């Protein structure tokens, strides 16, 4: 089975933005604009969660849809994969800020006594 990399998927989304193909789904998303793209990213995120609860086949399918829509979003916003890779690289070996917050575990450290 042929495979496609994230980079290829991004390049495909970029190509479709630069050279629209009338009638294509990708062109439809770009024509509708950011709000439509964001709505689709939200829908696909939910479907990934539901797919994960069901089975791996559904998880893989829905994750592929989400990745496609994320690439369209990145292109729409002018964010490159290198921007994402740089951000990920900047996090290597660093403790997440989330771990410094008490509420990430549900602790009520900052809650006032009643």
Curated annotation (Swiss-Prot):
Signal peptide: none annotated. It is an enzyme of class 3 (hydrolase). GO terms for biological process: L-histidine biosynthetic process. GO terms for cellular component: cytoplasm. The keyword Oxidoreductase does not apply. Pathway: Amino-acid biosynthesis; L-histidine biosynthesis; L-histidine from 5-phospho-alpha-D-ribose 1-diphosphate: step 2/9. The keyword Nucleotide-binding applies. It is found in: Cytoplasm. Keywords: Amino-acid biosynthesis, ATP-binding, Cytoplasm, Histidine biosynthesis, Hydrolase, Nucleotide-binding. GO terms for molecular function: ATP binding; phosphoribosyl-ATP diphosphatase activity. InterPro entries: HisE, PRib-ATP_PPHydrolase-like. Belongs to the PRA-PH family. PANTHER family: HISTIDINE BIOSYNTHESIS BIFUNCTIONAL PROTEIN (PTHR42945), HISTIDINE BIOSYNTHESIS BIFUNCTIONAL PROTEIN HISIE (PTHR42945:SF9). This is Phosphoribosyl-ATP pyrophosphatase. It comes from Leuconostoc mesenteroides subsp. mesenteroides (strain ATCC 8293 / DSM 20343 / BCRC 11652 / CCM 1803 / JCM 6124 / NCDO 523 / NBRC 100496 / NCIMB 8023 / NCTC 12954 / NRRL B-1118 / 37Y). The gene is hisE.
């Amino acid at each position: 089975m042929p495979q496609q990399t994230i980079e290829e998927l991004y390049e495909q989304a970029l190509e479709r933005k630069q050279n629209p193909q009338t009638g294509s789904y990708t062109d439809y998303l770009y024509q509708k604009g950011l709000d439509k793209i964001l709505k689709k990213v939200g829908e696909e995120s939910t479907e990934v969660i539901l797919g994960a609860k069901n089975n791996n086949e559904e998880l893989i399918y829905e994750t592929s849809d989400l990745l496609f829509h994320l690439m369209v979003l990145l292109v729409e916003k002018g964010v490159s994969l290198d921007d994402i890779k740089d951000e990920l690289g900047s996090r290597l070996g660093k403790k997440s800020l989330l771990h410094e917050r008490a509420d990430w575990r549900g602790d009520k450290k900052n809650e006032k006594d009643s």
